[in-house]
Amino acid sequence: MSKASALMVQGTTSDAGKSTLVAGLARALVRRGVRVAPFKPQNMALNSAVTADGGEIGRAQALQAVAARIAPHTDFNPVLLKPSSDIGAQVIIHGKVMANLSARDYHAYKPTAMAAVMASFDRLSAQYEHVLIEGAGSPAEINLRDRDIANMGFAEAADVPVVLVADIDRGGVFAHLVGTLELLSPSEQARVRGFVINRFRGDIALLQPGLDWLTERTGRPVFGVLPYLHGLFLDAEDALANGQVAADRDGAVLKVIAPVYPRISNHTDLDALRLHPQVDFRWVGPGQAIPPADLVVLPGSKSVQADLAWLRAQGWEPALRRHLRYGGKVIGICGGFQMLGSTLADPHGLEGAPSTVAGLGALDIETVLEREKQLVNVRGRLALDGEAAVAGYEIHMGVSRGADLDRPAVLLEDGRADGALSADGQVLGTYLHGLFDTPQAVAALLDWAGLKGAAGVDLNARREADLDRLADAVEAHVDMAALFGAAWPDAA
């Protein structure tokens, strides 16, 4: 397959709509019978997924694979950076941990990372009719241009055309598009075939003069203006977006809260709770009062000791004691599970200097962080009722031991037991991400938390419906013939 059948979607900013547009195009193409694969050369994200080949990739690429109706694979995201501090990250190459590097050291490593990127891209180019590539952040970050492998550096190396997407909802869309284009080199500018504007609300006729000006100013077409799709619920790539903090609902019965630590990871684990019509779910950020709740969920963390210290500084430790004293329930997932134990040891300095810290003491377990990361997709049943199906995945470097493990949270199909339940039955911990991803597990866990007779939420069905809704919008509002014709004129 010629590399001309690849198209790269770059954005004027982070959260401009790159991931969404790639997912929508992928679903639209696969519905036409086209074999298409997603690809992101380098992703920096704390939300990740486990692939069928036993590796780890960004969650956005896993979602795009679902959109393309193929199994997620490590080639879809060959370089994943998981920040562990403001100046360093865990570097994952082809799904496996390579090292923890500072920003300066990673910059020196980029030529090696680029080789991994090109190897994955070449494999995908040989297997699929089209490859839809997603950039990262903005291609016009001047300080990141040297040795760039995420945006134009990759586009130049792979010789692929580019479409620029911008979010009109945040304002300044014309300045974003024109400014980005003008900050590119002449050869990079020549790759940009045109634009897509995302999240438009209002009368398109009032926008048309601006679109005409943009085409006249740049000599490039606007391929489409995607509307603001209210209620679209797709897996977030990384940080919690505005509007995801609270989910007030009339008629909500169960109050659920979760802290937003600095290095929160895989917060998508709680999506089913945020969608549940009988759950009043709230993220609690730094400096915010900790409200009363029926259930507290401690989500995953990339830097467990540091986020545990943050919890203490924010007053969560006494709040959890009060919560349990008055009969509340607590669930800890992965890093949150580790925090609930009596001690957390990092003898190899995986998260900083080697150290051992006291946990919250809600579970009788001790955790030691080990060098080898566990990456596996699993299925099983909740031990609470022995019946509710669970389908999730493990991404962790900790090994836990202790008496409360004798009361597991989940019984896995491979014969293992996972997690722990406290002696009083109020605290549950598990290493399984995706704990709430099946309707049966949602119903059983909410029943345990106090919402008797709770209904389930089918997250997979909702995801499929929203991907089709997104693809419908792409088909209706993006001139796909013009887009792909401009990208691949020889194939038109």
Curated annotation (Swiss-Prot):
Database matches in Gene3D superfamilies: 3.40.50.880, P-loop containing nucleotide triphosphate hydrolases (3.40.50.300)
Membrane-crossing segments per the record: none
GO function terms (MF aspect): ABC-type vitamin B12 transporter activity; catalytic activity
Catalytic residues identified in the record: C334 (nucleophile), H433
Swiss-Prot/TrEMBL GO biological process terms: cobalamin biosynthetic process
UniProt entry keywords in alphabetical sequence: Cobalamin biosynthesis, Glutamine amidotransferase
Record InterPro entries: Class_I_gatase-like, CobQ/CobB/MinD/ParA_Nub-bd_dom, CobQ_GATase1, CobQ_N, CobQ_synth, GATase_3, P-loop_NTPase
Domain of life, per lineage: Bacteria
GATase cobBQ-type domain segment(s): 253-441
Pathway(s): Cofactor biosynthesis; adenosylcobalamin biosynthesis
PANTHER family for the chain: COBYRIC ACID SYNTHASE, DETHIOBIOTIN SYNTHETASE
Family statement drawn from the similarity comment of this UniProt entry: Belongs to the CobB/CobQ family. CobQ subfamily.
Role according to the record: Catalyzes amidations at positions B, D, E, and G on adenosylcobyrinic A,C-diamide. NH(2) groups are provided by glutamine, and one molecule of ATP is hydrogenolyzed for each amidation.
Protein name in UniProt: Cobyric acid synthase
Species, as recorded: Azoarcus sp. (strain BH72)
Taxonomic lineage from the root: Bacteria, Pseudomonadati, Pseudomonadota, Betaproteobacteria, Rhodocyclales
Gene: cobQ
